Amino acid sequence: MLSEHHHQLLKATIPLLEAGGEALTRHFYGIMLSEYPEVRPLFNQAHQASGAQPRALANGILQYARHIDRLDALGPLVGQIVNKHVSLQVLPEQYPIVGSCLLRAIREVLGAEVATDAVIAAWAAAYQQLADLLIGAEEGVYADSAAAPGGWRGARPFQVARKVIESDEIVSLYLQPADGGAVMTFRPGQYIGLKLTVDGQEVRRNYSLSAPPNGSTYRISVKREPGGVVSNFLHDAVGTGATIDLFPPSGDFVLQPGNRPLVLISGGVGITPTLPMLHAAHEQSRPVTFLHFARSGRVHAFRDWVDDLVARHAQARRFYCYEEDGAAPADAYGRSSAELLDRWMPTPRDLDVYFVGPPAFMGAIKRMLGELGVPAGQMHWEFFGPAAALEG
């Protein structure tokens, strides 16, 4: 239980976290990943190397300290953490490892004069409070997934039923349960967790579900990333008939019910979670505008599928913008701009807008949407990787 004295000590560390939180989390990951190899599969080494994961954790710790008096304000952050943990199957027994490494990092980075026994005790109590909150929420999701029709808990073997080349960079895998059973439904926008063995090492990754739910199979669509351990493995080494362990669908970037016109904006492989959303809009006869930005027609996946669906939906429109002028025609050439959004989005701007793509792309889209009058509460976005503050 956190005491008032604990609260005061935690708040006193906020300036230190603001100034050096990323150094602390880098040290934390260095300790944990070197001394506890059993947790390495939960972490993407590319995100470690880029600093994205340490930055995300530093931001999470800082937000927790800032809101220690009113944890209800952390709702969106807690939801993101729970969904990521569930998709990778983080378990209660792994929390003490994280806690001990975090307290050690606080002591070693801040120094014994600042990180006194009292400060460490305050952070130990705060961490336990957060761990209990997350463990309880995650157990609820695990139990719900196991109880759902076609649901399961933990890893479930799936086989690659089909492998389809979608563009020069993207390949789709159609996955069906090895046991021949049904699969649980999911909400448009959610992702699935994969458990793989690559070069003798276990790795886990999330991929958006890119086809509407059908009760029997899932589809993921993977962009080949230069140097990407898992994406290149899925492109080059996984074929029809291969077995992949999957964790149940999760994620809080989902299409919300409503009657407002819908706008879906994607950049590159960010198109994947918007496809089930577009299909849902078609099923609901909901007005929808689909905007996709790509480098060229060669890397634009699912164009024919989108064109066909839009042609069958009386209240749907679609627009494409390519950076390069090539063989495939587009509605515009260049990069995303406020002028294009203004031209293509419906008016009035009382819209629900969902956008996904590289962080810089999403930051620009968010800024432009605000300039064009879209209410902040009606903008929704998803990070592929560690969640971060979206500048824009």
Model-predicted regions and their roles:
Residues 1-154:
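Globin-like tetrapyrrole-binding proteins
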Residues 17, 288-392:
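Reductase modules of NAD(P)H-dependent flavoproteins
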Residues 148-243, 294-296, 307, 321-325:
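Ferredoxin-reductase
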Residues 189, 270, 358:
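Short, conserved phosphate/pyrophosphate- and ester-handling motifs at nucleotide-, phospho-/glycolipid
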Residues 247-260:
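A short, basic/flexible loop-to-alpha-helix module at the beginning of a structural domain
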Residues 271-282:
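Histidine-anchored nucleotide/phosphate-binding helix
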